[in-house]
Design a protein with these regions (language model features):
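Transmembrane beta-strands of outer-membrane beta-barrel proteins
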Residues: 114-118, 174-176, 193, 208-217, ...
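Transmembrane beta-strands of outer-membrane beta-barrel pores
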Residues: 120-124, 180-186, 197-199, 217-223, ...
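Outer-membrane beta-barrel "beta-signal"
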Residues: 195, 403-417
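Outer-membrane beta-barrel translocator/channel fold
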Residues: 211-309, 314-324, 403, 407
Length: 417
């Protein structure tokens, strides 16, 4: 048995190593992230450091910080802002696709048990939503527009995730697992850890007519992405009942519930990658300029001056005539932190013959996703309606699309006991 255990362990290690060392030709894949397209801007001609924005001139179609924003009398190279609305829906649906896999009944492997398996999960996506059309690269032939104003004609309908899952039985009904996941057509990887505790298992007489019951905690975190941090935490409760067919085949249906918490954060994103903040503004300094708001506005500075971070000497503007304070240092940003929850139902069936195991599982949202920590309204999109004098410009609260996701998983593996 020790030799058998070492063999799948070595195979699993070699498999993970080969996946991590796969050669890449440097080209972006369709599902790679393109967060610099999730931006918006206001093309009001730049006066007084942009304080007097016309609310009707907010543009929510990417392409900020470029000469293209000067079309129709607008301000060229308009300042960039992070689009947290589309970001929220991207984090939500990507988090479900990378959620920890289960594909196992409530009964654990036992103290000497060991499992290694390959899992393929398919999750539906809201392909027509701008979160996917702008937030992922797409193929060259599927793009409409250019640069950061580009969008896919349609996003992917499903996310396909391959997963290598290894589990080891522990004393007292515990089981420890680890998994490595890869989102197909992308360079997105995730690693995870899960711990399961079977509170009631193994009885075959008397109370053995009752199903086995187990709870599990799991976590998956995305790796290798500098601009995005994504962690998915799962809490599961599972019921299952094993049946023996012909003395050799074990058939185990299982049913359970899952609570998912998706934690999405971003690093600093450059929304105008074709420009250089250092070349345009090698040295920044605070300057005081006249506050252009009318004297009757309660928000006007009492001194009549406002401090702005502007460029010192030595910078080179992106285009002749461009205001010096409209430089590329304004075109980087961080998306708001997203804390999202899902309540899911899981149903599946496992078939085991000797050491060979095949499992099928279907998980689905029982209700629409929601925030367990609501983002600040200040992070929402600005309203295109005029603001009331003396009050901040109104913003639209960030919401999640009323879209329920499902995941179908097929797993094949070897179980040693």
């Amino acid at each position: 048995m020790r030799a058998l255990v070492r063999t799948p362990l070595a195979a699993a290690s070699l498999f993970a190593l080969s996946l991590s060392l796969q050669a890449r030709d440097g080209r972006a894949d369709p599902m790679d992230l393109s967060l610099n397209r999730l931006s918006y801007y206001n093309d009001t001609p730049w006066v007084g450091g942009g304080v007097n924005y016309d609310p009707a001139r907010w543009r929510f179609n990417g392409g900020c910080g470029t000469s293209a924003t000067g079309a129709a009398g607008g301000q060229p190279f308009a300042q960039c802002y992070a689009d947290n609305q589309r970001w929220a829906n991207l984090v939500n649906q990507l988090g479900v696709a990378l959620a920890p896999g289960l594909s196992a009944p409530a009964m654990t492997l036992g103290f000497s048990g060991f499992y290694v398996g390959y899992e393929m999960a398919v999750t539906n996506l809201q392909s027509e939503d701008d979160a996917w059309r702008r937030g992922t690269q797409g193929g060259l032939t599927s793009l409409v527009g250019t640069g950061t104003a580009a969008s896919r004609d349609r996003g992917d309908t499903n996310a396909f995730v391959s997963r290598l899952h290894v589990r080891k039985g522990l004393p007292l009904g515990f089981e420890l697992g680890t998994q490595v996941s890869h989102l197909h057509s992308s360079n997105i990887w995730a690693i995870g850890l899960d711990l399961r505790w079977s509170l009631f298992e193994g009885f075959r007489r008397g109370i053995g007519y009752l199903p086995d019951f187990a709870i599990r905690g799991s976590v998956n975190t995305m790796v290798g992405q500098q601009q995005m941090s994504l962690t998915v935490v799962g809490l599961d409760a599972m019921l299952s009942k094993r049946f023996t067919l012909g003395g050799q085949v074990r058939l185990t249906p299982f049913l359970g519930g899952q609570y998912l918490m998706i934690l999405g954060d971003s690093g600093v994103v450059d929304f105008s990658p074709t420009r250089s903040a250092f070349n345009e503004c090698p040295r920044q300094e605070i300057r005081y300029v006249a506050d252009p708001r009318p004297p009757a506005d309660p928000l006007r500075s009492p001194s009549g001056l406002i401090g702005q971070l502007q460029c010192g000497t030595g910078g080179q503007v992106a285009a002749p005539g461009l205001p010096g304070d409209l430089n590329d240092t304004r075109n980087s940003g961080v998306f708001a932190a997203m804390r999202i929850q899902h309540a899911r139902m899981i149903a599946g069936l496992q078939l085991q013959w000797e050491i060979f195991t095949v499992s099928g599982e279907f998980a689905f949202d029982m209700m629409p996703p929601s925030f367990f920590r609501t983002p600040s309204t200040d992070a929402g999109l600005p309203s295109t309606s005029p603001a009331v004098m003396g009050q901040p410009a109104p913003r639209t609260p960030i919401t999640l699309n009323d879209y329920r996701q499902w995941t179908t998983t097929i797993a094949v593996g070897l179980t040693f006991q």
